[in-house]
Amino acid sequence: MTARTHHVPLRIAVSSGALSPQVAALLSRQRAEEPQTPVVLEEVSVCEQVCGLEDGRYDLGLALTTAPGHSLNAQPLWHDELALAVPIRSPLLNFTAVPLEEFAHYPLIRWRSDEYDPVDQLMERMQQQACTPPEIFCVRTFELMAILVAAGYGIGLGAKSRIAAARELDIIMRPLAGDRQELTTYILRPPCELPPSVDRLAERAQAISG
């Protein structure tokens, strides 16, 4: 395939579950090391992300999926884990890691995104152990989940690093007891030759620990 025309600025598509402190670190590093190449970040669904990468609207993507069945190249970048968001006065704070049977007594606010498979896996595990929460609410954004948790409507599920970084929203992170529910952020690249500036951005992403 022919090389893609250089885009200024670089356009990065991020599906909602993949937003994390590492993304902020990547943007900061890009500005410090290559300020002449700005980056535009766009939050999209996985479907929009895949289509946009394949048709040339985006240069790179960050997602919690490898986009199987498509022509994109996926490489693992950062690793996180599923954790609980609890209110600042929750009895669950007595646990350093919360067992399933304990948080199953509370309404669960799950951050619903089309690529958040680890949440579905955890829900299946809870059903197998007969400890399904009394109520399950689905929301589309992390911010709404955090607001509802802080207001006492239930407890939330999300990425450990993002919950821990949102302490100012009056929510506190607690890990889940038992087997770790891993979340992996992948960098998605279109199947064509990319300009060197895109390759450099991808290298910076790979250099950030997570």
What are these regions (language model features)?
Residues I12-A13, L82, V98-V119, Q206:
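Short loop->beta-strand "edge-of-pocket" segments that line small-molecule binding or catalytic clefts
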Residues S45-V50, E54-R57, A63-L64, D114-R174:
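Hydrophobic hinge/microswitch elements
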Residues P9-A13, G61, A85, I109, ...:
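Short, well-ordered beta-strand segments
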Residues R4, A74-L82, V86-L108, D199:
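Flexible hinge/capping segments at coil-to-helix
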Residues A25-E33, V40-V86, V149-A151, D170-R174:
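Short beta-strand-centered segments that line the small-molecule binding cleft or hinge
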Residues Q22, Y153, I172-G210:
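A late-sequence structural motif
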Residues P21-V23, P107-Q129, P195-V198, A202:
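Secondary-structure junction motif
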Residues T2-C51, G158, L194-D199:
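N-terminal winged-helix
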